């Protein structure tokens, strides 16, 4: 079994926030792969799905971002899931909008959700870094990630989540490079190969 974790904050107040793109990705995967109904478990919302030939536990921690590791650690212990089988979907300021990078281990880049998971579970889990762009000034980051995606951003967010869901079976099978490439090609095919953050001017 693999564990797919989407990071975000619980409740309608945060549902459309840039920081919640991990939740959005998991919701899209659950819909596409006809996952079981979400239920309260492991200090979050949990579901199960079969992606390709792999059984996958889907988890959206409801601990708030800074305590995400508590939910991940509980689910990991219950199912005895190895850290190498844990995949975390999260927002990434250091990637432009629509850009996706998959990596194992590495730093937390100031992301409190990743910091919590690393502290409680270890560092060698997989990250699916979902680019949201950077506001350009460190002082603006907090407000930027806790604001909703702008109306103009919603089309690429929806297409990104659809592409992640379409190719999630590759990720479940451990084919991370193929997954990343397929998602990139899907977004490129929909015209999202040079998306700027809202407010940025085209070069």
From Swiss-Prot:
Residues of the site described as Stabilizes the basic form of H active site to accept a proton: 91
Gene Ontology cellular component list: cytoplasm
UniProt KW keywords: Cytoplasm, Hydrolase, RNA-binding, tRNA-binding
Top EC class, one word: hydrolase
Compartments in which it is found: Cytoplasm
Main location, first listed in the record: cytoplasm
This protein's record includes keyword RNA-binding: yes
Site (Discriminates between blocked and unblocked aminoacyl-tRNA): 9
Reactions that this protein is recorded to catalyse: an N-acyl-L-alpha-aminoacyl-tRNA + H2O = an N-acyl-L-amino acid + a tRNA + H(+)
Positions of the catalytic residues: 19 (proton acceptor)
Protein role: Hydrolyzes ribosome-free peptidyl-tRNAs (with 1 or more amino acids incorporated), which drop off the ribosome during protein synthesis, or as a result of ribosome stalling.
Subunit structure: Monomer.
UniProt protein name: Peptidyl-tRNA hydrolase
Species of origin: Methylobacterium nodulans (strain LMG 21967 / CNCM I-2342 / ORS 2060)
Name of the gene: pth
């Amino acid at each position: 079994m693999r564990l797919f974790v989407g990071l975000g904050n619980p409740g309608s107040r945060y549902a459309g926030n840039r920081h919640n793109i991990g939740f959005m990705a998991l919701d899209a995967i659950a819909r596409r792969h006809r996952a079981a109904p979400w239920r309260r478990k492991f200090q979050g919302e949990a579901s199960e799905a079969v992606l390709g030939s792999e059984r996958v536990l889907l988890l959206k921690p409801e601990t708030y971002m800074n305590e995400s590791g508590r939910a991940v650690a509980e689910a990991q212990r219950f199912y005895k899931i190895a850290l190498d089988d844990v995949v975390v979907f999260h927002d990434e300021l250091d990637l432009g909008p629509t850009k996706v990078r998959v990596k194992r281990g590495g730093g937390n880049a100031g992301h409190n959700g990743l910091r919590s998971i690393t502290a409680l579970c270890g560092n060698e889990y997989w990250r699916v870094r979902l680019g949201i762009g950077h506001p350009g000034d460190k002082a603006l980051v907090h407000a930027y990630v806790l604001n909703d995606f702008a109306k103009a951003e919603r089309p690429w967010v929806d297409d990104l989540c659809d592409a992640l869901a379409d190719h999630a079976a590759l990720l479940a099978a451990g084919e991370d490079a193929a997954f990343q490439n397929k998602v990139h090609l899907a977004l490129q095919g929909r015209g999202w190969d040079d998306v700027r953050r809202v407010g940025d001017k085209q070069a």
